[in-house]
């Protein structure tokens, strides 16, 4: 499968596939361990900034629905840009580039606001539409409902995977959003087995802490709060960017460099 998809150690003669796999895994944990403290800081910053969006999602289904809707509206205008800023920080950690956490986060929020705003809106609204559609087909029953529900579920998986690639491309390339989404969709399909594996890892972590919160007991709430506020978000992001960055780099960055080299030679 090519776990995490990186090649920090180049593949050469005499190196088995299993050995390369081990090197990739070791490289991931080595990088994550060295950046652990910085990732906690980035996690706290991102968690605090998207907290209104999280609260909005939770409260819209409660007796505080009006407050939830207000917070959700705020989230519509901030979630995408905040996520792009967070992704920039994580990408730089993966690339082993220096990061000025607060200033870089603020700067990237401003720089990528326009292009990441619509993606953030899609990220909030589209899952709601999928959930409504899935519940509808679940209730009507029958084979048609099963097939339709399967299609909705597959669409949700592809949608989540597209985000793996869209935000790193937003903070790296000067492309229009439709081109970013097109490329992200191609990556989602071409690298589907690896993407699905990473989605399962990410989903398991988020699901665990979400279930702790929904347990409605004090210990569960504390576990959920500590997990989400300190490391869950940055760990999921680091796993994802560490995996997809090599694919983006190989397919888009090296290609751009080759085209630039040809252009210079022709001059």
Give a label for each model feature.
Residues 147-159:
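Alpha-helical transmembrane segments of multi-pass membrane proteins
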